Amino acid sequence: MFHDVNDSETSRDEPGLEVRSYFVRGRNALLTRADFGELYVDYYLHQGQLGAQHEPAHDELLKQALAAVTLHAAARPWSESVAWTIHLREPLLNLFVAGDNRLGTVIGQLFTEDVKDDGRQLFVADVVRERADSRRSAVEFAGGDVFRAVEQYYVQSEQRPARFFQYGPEDFVFLSAQPQCDLAWLEGLDDAAMLTLDHTEELSLLETRRYRWECGCTQVRMFAVLAQVMRADPEGLFGAEPVLRMNCPRCGARHTITREALEAYVSGK
């Protein structure tokens, strides 16, 4: 049932975050919902391993973005992966989150250093689907709420409305319009209506998907990131040092790259 996201033995036994998708009959809307407590624990464990600590307000923004990209991904085809970069002016920072439906993974990071204020807030979405060209769209948005930013992205880029609601402390619901959606109903929903939605509307469970916190970054992937620069300017990359230390741009994990190993990788390509 909609009112309990953890009401099955399967949800307790299988690893990873469970996201349930429902079709709202008669309204033509797709609803995805999950409790993100488990994913947030994995995020904090990852930060602890890195020795990183963000301001609580910044953490909340990234947690919102992680919830948003996961619920969005669960509403998209299985063959699709998505990455969002969200530039905020106040506080001045960049959020990066990504979800891969094929692998069932979610990752994210926030950046506060060397972030320039260019006078606008920007939401950049990169979408990759199997056997199709990647697609990028960028929209400007107002305000400092991540969920509202995604809603503005939907209106401007997806050309359809979508709504986020907080059902519990770490329990979020996402509703997106489908063809012939009852737009007046969708746009008129509020928090009180969401609490009784399973009693007032006919919800049909479509599927469940599972997501886990995982980047998949490896030293070989870091080689691929650095290969072009290594070919063009190895001295500028390493200087006189035999070792380069870098952070994964997706999750912040630290990698140590030796010049010898990178040279071998580049020469083998």
Residue ranges and their predicted role:
Residues F2-L206:
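Interaction interfaces in information-processing and related assembly proteins
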Residues Q178-K269:
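Cys/His-clustered metal-coordination modules, chiefly Zn-binding fingers
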